[in-house]
Amino acid sequence: MDTLLEAIDVCNVDGFCFGNYTNEEAGTGCTVIVAPEGATGGVDVRGGAPASRETDLLRPENTVDTVHAVCLSGGSAFGLEAASGVARELESRGIGLPVGPTQVPIVCSSCIFDLAFGDPTVRPDIEAGIAAVREALDHTPATLEQGNVGAGTGATVGKLMGPATCMKAGLGAAAVALGPVKVGAVVSVNACGNVVDPFTGEWVAGMRVAADSDQIVDMELAAFAAAGSMQMPLDRTNTTISCIVTNVELTKAQATKVSQMAADAYAHAIRPTHTTNDGDTIYTLASGKLGAQASAAVPLDLLGMLAVRALQTAIVNGAKTAKTSHGIPGAAK
């Protein structure tokens, strides 16, 4: 299958623009995925502690079927404010659901907990959301920057035993093309678990043996060894949030199924994952730029497999490109 797949930049998935807002000093930021002409959306919320906006709107039985942006943000629940800035900027550009006197942009959002990483009093706000949209639409980067940027600025992994032995992670992106079908993924990797490269089996980032060590320990084995005495000091402070994008035309139900299938990428690249202390959320946006006839010929299961491939690669990229920051070591040299 690898001989048929072409690795492309996520910015080459038709119908979408991407932008970051980064506050490196405060250790937080946000990332926006904009669909200027709208996209059909779906979502899978699998973690036990999500911070999100407009996820109920994406349920297949609900009325609105067009999404104009997804905002991935730091700041925990405070970071949901950035989505209001995204909506405000899109409205000013005439992007949104027509409602008579104006347009209402449909903006979904999820946040990671990064308040313990940098300055907990600084969170992505309305101005941050506006800045991210302006980067996406005014500068239209050909390549989405990864690592310590956007929603990945304050992301960390390997936190089973607390912050002293965790590692830096960040924003990751990847995309693949199979003929005219394009599927991409953007992810903020802020997991309780370790990141493993599913293609090699090697640890990329995660819990270290000690604060002064670079050796990564298998968190699952550590948990088994600790048995009932294990305590998790960072309850509800972990979330891996992501957005799948595709040029295929989908219904809301189909987009939701792609999100559900894409959750396999978390299991492939993060160990453990979907814990009660993670708020794992996966959005899917379908632009339909491939066209109705060509899209109808694409099996939904195939699309889901492509989403898994893109997302697991993006997760690994988010860990590999993260640099040491605020005293927490990263895998990028």
Where are these regions (language model features)?
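Acidic/His-rich segments in extracytoplasmic proteins that coordinate ligands and/or metal ions
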Residues: A87
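A structural signal for small-residue-enriched, beta-sheet-centric alpha/beta enzyme cores
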Residues: D2-A77, E81-S84, S92-K333
